A protein has these predicted regions:
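Mid-to-C-terminal alpha-helical segments outside catalytic/metal-binding sites
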Residues: 13, 23-31, 295-343
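Active-site gating/metal-coordination segments in enzymes
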Residues: 103-106, 111-113, 117-187, 243, ...
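Short acidic/histidine-rich active-site segments
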Residues: 194-196, 247-249, 268-290
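Catalytic pocket-lining loop regions of alpha/beta-barrel enzymes
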Residues: 183, 187-262
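Divalent metal-coordination and catalytic microenvironments
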Residues: 44, 86, 186, 244, ...
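Alpha-helical scaffold segments that flank or form the walls of functional sites
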Residues: 39-43, 48, 56-111, 137-156
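Bacterial Sec-dependent signal peptides at the C-terminal "C-region" and cleavage site
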Residues: 1-3, 9-24
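Histidine/acidic-residue-rich catalytic or RNA/ligand-binding cores of hydrolases
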Residues: 51-55, 98, 124, 203-209, ...
Length: 343
């Protein structure tokens, strides 16, 4: 009888493990976490950014203690608003520092998510020479290895892919390569792709590359979508399954309110993310001018409520949508958005 009970217990434990593995997960700087839709997210922010460019950037000169002392008060402010997840969208060669993010996460208790990928904005100012020479397949192997083994010989692993393109009549060949490499990385890892894009003119060719590579638009976040003037582009992007990120709340409010009202009227709030694109510590400045990460809570949400937004709609923007957007899940083209829902 004891032997039978032990076997039953082992079967129950095995089933529990399998169920746990199938539930959506996120990768933050401290490890993988099982997700639900009850946590508050800031889905596009920055802790440190260094615009000096790939030729001159010197991460080894950054004083972690000084940076942590400067940035911690802004994280302390988040406790009043119960922020659980903080997505640091700073890419490699623009200020990504995995160990710094890990230290801040441990100190503040906020779960920070970092990225792999490369940033082509600014005529490839932040693209290292090796990336210009490699194929998309070779680039993707580097990014996949960061997800498997950690960033720069650390235990910190990325929770999404961050790329960036310049908007033009046609994508620069390097930027086409970045998008394809991101798509290939997604197919191997399930990491969501967040692309600095801006106007919709730069979105459609990226989604076409994803489609050609066999990746669903549901794996893709249209970053800085507030730059688009034609709101009908949001209808098209939402219909395709793309995530639409209005992430400049730290810099401007009225445009974000107008666009969120458009999304509400047209029934597409379930594809929208909101964030500040705020911060950040700049190693090139002696005196820092850091923007807080709280404007959503102190200014935007009261305005949205005054315009008739319900608690459920606000929960959608700050909890449900980002949980789904950053869930690690391979989403091949075509993708049934109803196929997998968070519990």
């Amino acid at each position: 009888m004891v032997k039978i009970d032990c076997i039953i217990l082992l079967l129950i434990m095995a089933c529990g493990c399998n169920l746990s593995e199938k539930r959506p997960q996120i990768q933050d700087v401290q490890g993988k976490q099982i997700l639900n839709s009850d946590n508050i997210w800031l889905s596009h922010e920055h802790i440190l950014v260094d615009f000096i460019g790939v030729a001159n950037i010197q991460p080894e000169t950054w004083n972690h203690d000084s940076i942590i002392k400067e940035i911690t008060p802004y994280f302390e402010e988040l406790k009043a608003f119960n922020v659980k997840y903080f997505v640091d969208a700073t890419p490699n060669y623009l200020g990504r520092d995995a160990l710094l993010l890990e230290k801040i996460a441990i100190k503040t208790g906020v779960r920070i998510i970092t990225n792999t990928g490369l940033y082509g904005v600014g005529n490839n100012k932040y693209i290292p020479q090796y990336a210009l020479d490699l194929t998309a397949e070779e680039l993707s192997e580097i990014w996949i290895n960061e997800y498997k083994y950690g960033i720069h010989k650390t235990s910190v692993k990325p929770g999404f892919v961050k790329i960036g393109i310049d908007v033009a009549d046609s994508l620069h060949p390097m930027h086409q390569k970045l998008v394809k490499a991101a798509a290939l990385t997604h197919l191997k890892t399930g990491l969501t792709i967040a692309s600095h894009t801006g106007k919709a003119k730069g979105l459609w060719p990226q989604l076409e590359i994803l489609k050609e590579t066999g990746v669903s638009p549901a794996s893709f976040i249209w970053v800085h979508a507030q730059a688009e003037d034609n709101n009908d582009s949001y209808l098209k992007a939402a219909e395709m399954g793309c995530w639409i990120s209005l992430d400049g709340v730290g810099w401007e409010l009225e445009k974000h309110i107008e666009k969120l009202l458009f999304a509400k009227r047209n029934g597409i709030l379930d594809r929208f993310l909101i964030s500040h694109d705020a911060g950040w510590y700049d190693p090139q400045k002696e005196i820092q001018t850091i923007k807080p990460f709280t404007t959503i809570f102190t200014q935007l949400l009261p305005e949205l409520k005054s315009h008739g937004f319900t608690d459920d709609e606000i929960k959608l923007l700050l909890r449900v949508n980002p949980s789904k957007a950053f869930a690690i899940e391979i989403r091949k083209y075509p993708f049934d958005k109803r196929a997998k829902q968070l519990e």
